[in-house]
Amino acid sequence: KDALVYGQMNEPPGARMRVGLKDGSITSIQAV
C-alpha cells in the first residue's frame, strides 16, 4: 500500500481520491 500512496502523489487530487476510495483506504488520502 505504501507504493500506492507514493504513486498517488503523482496523480491529480481527483484521481488520487478515486484510487483511495477504490482501495478503501481514506487515511492514505488524508496523509497526502
Curated annotation (Swiss-Prot):
It is found in: Plastid, Chloroplast thylakoid membrane. GO terms for cellular component: chloroplast thylakoid membrane; proton-transporting ATP synthase complex. GO terms for molecular function: ATP binding. It catalyses: ATP + H2O + 4 H(+)(in) = ADP + phosphate + 5 H(+)(out). Keywords: ATP synthesis, ATP-binding, CF(1), Chloroplast, Hydrogen ion transport, Ion transport, Membrane, Nucleotide-binding, Plastid, Thylakoid, Translocase, Transport. It comes from the Eukaryota. Its EC number is 7.1.2.2. Induction: The 56 kDa isoform is constitutively expressed. The 54 kDa isoform increases 9-fold during 10 hours of high light stress and decreases after 24 hours of photoinhibitory treatment. GO terms for biological process: ATP biosynthetic process; proton transmembrane transport. Its main location: plastid. Belongs to the ATPase alpha/beta chains family. Two isoforms of 54 and 56 kDa with the same peptide fingerprint are found in the chloroplast. The synthesis of the major 56 kDa isoform is coupled to the assembly into the thylakoid membrane, while the 54 kDa isoform accumulates in response to various light stress conditions. F-type ATPases have 2 components, CF(1) - the catalytic core - and CF(0) - the membrane proton channel. CF(1) has five subunits: alpha(3), beta(3), gamma(1), delta(1), epsilon(1). CF(0) has four main subunits: a(1), b(1), b'(1) and c(9-12). Produces ATP from ADP in the presence of a proton gradient across the membrane. The catalytic sites are hosted primarily by the beta subunits. This is ATP synthase subunit beta, chloroplastic. The gene is atpB.
